[in-house]
């Protein structure tokens, strides 16, 4: 059973009772997943950006969008319009597929993994987790990467509070640490 079907058939009715909601449309759901990577070296090294775009496409199954500097910052040696990172926004079936692979395959492959921080919610039910290396994803092989780079993964939910968001992610299988 896919994560999307599991959400519709078992998680949504369970959350409806747990959260004491009256309507099934009030139950929090995952709206989108943003995968973002900032590349400071992209200003001087165009191959780093190219490699990063390919890795993001391999991990997410969707072409990455190049993010550009909004204004020049002399201290960082960047000018307005220079490429400084890449991002992918996943919705629908690709989002559920990525979430399933991230929770069940990638997270357990993190070294010394004891669960994700339960305090990384933003106050509106959205959750962000930082990944230090792209090697946790089974699609990326160690031989094909030029350097280890991290990324930020933001799970945007329709939850109105952190408690609702946490309840949703726990039901989806997100392994929160006990601290």
Curated annotation (Swiss-Prot):
Q: Which Pfam families match?
A: Ribosomal_L5, Ribosomal_L5_C
What are this entry's molecular-function GO terms? rRNA binding; structural constituent of ribosome; tRNA binding
User: Which Cys pairs does UniProt list as disulfide-bonded?
Assistant: none
* Gene3D superfamilies documented for this protein: 3.30.1440.10
Residue ranges the record marks as coiled coil: none
Swiss-Prot/TrEMBL keywords: Ribonucleoprotein, Ribosomal protein, RNA-binding, rRNA-binding, tRNA-binding
Q: Which SUPFAM superfamilies does its entry note?
A: RL5-like
| PROSITE patterns reported in the protein's UniProt record | RIBOSOMAL_L5
Tell me which Gene Ontology terms the entry assigns under biological process.
Answer: translation
Superkingdom per UniProt: Bacteria
Gene Ontology CC: one annotated term:
ribonucleoprotein complex
InterPro entries, alphabetically? Ribosomal_uL5 (IPR002132), Ribosomal_uL5_bac-type (IPR020930), Ribosomal_uL5_C (IPR031309), Ribosomal_uL5_CS (IPR020929), Ribosomal_uL5_dom_sf (IPR022803), Ribosomal_uL5_N (IPR031310)
Assembly and interaction partners: Part of the 50S ribosomal subunit; part of the 5S rRNA/L5/L18/L25 subcomplex. Contacts the 5S rRNA and the P site tRNA. Forms a bridge to the 30S subunit in the 70S ribosome.
Q: Tell me its family.
A: Belongs to the universal ribosomal protein uL5 family.
Q: What's this chain's function?
A: This is one of the proteins that bind and probably mediate the attachment of the 5S RNA into the large ribosomal subunit, where it forms part of the central protuberance. In the 70S ribosome it contacts protein S13 of the 30S subunit (bridge B1b), connecting the 2 subunits; this bridge is implicated in subunit movement. Contacts the P site tRNA; the 5S rRNA and some of its associated proteins might help stabilize positioning of ribosome-bound tRNAs.
Name of the protein: Large ribosomal subunit protein uL5
Which gene name does the record give?
Answer: rplE
């Amino acid at each position: 059973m896919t994560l999307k079907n599991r959400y519709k058939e078992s998680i949504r009715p369970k959350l409806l009772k747990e959260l004491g909601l009256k309507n099934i449309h009030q139950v929090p759901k995952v709206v989108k997943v943003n995968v973002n990577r900032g590349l400071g070296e992209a200003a001087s090294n165009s191959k780093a950006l190219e490699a990063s775009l390919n890795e993001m496409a391999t991990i997410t199954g969707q072409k990455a969008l190049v993010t550009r500097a909004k204004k020049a910052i002399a201290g960082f040696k960047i000018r307005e319009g220079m490429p400084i990172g890449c991002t992918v926004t996943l919705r629908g079936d690709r989002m559920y597929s990525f979430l399933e692979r991230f929770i069940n395959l990638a997270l357990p492959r993190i070294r010394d993994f004891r669960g994700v921080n339960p305090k990384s919610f933003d106050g509106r039910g959205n959750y962000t987790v930082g990944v230090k290396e792209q090697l946790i994803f089974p699609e990326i092989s160690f031989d094909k990467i030029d350097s280890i780079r991290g990324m930020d993964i933001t799970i945007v939910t329709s939850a109105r509070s952190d408690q609702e968001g946490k309840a949703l992610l726990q039901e989806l299988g997100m392994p929160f640490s006990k601290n």
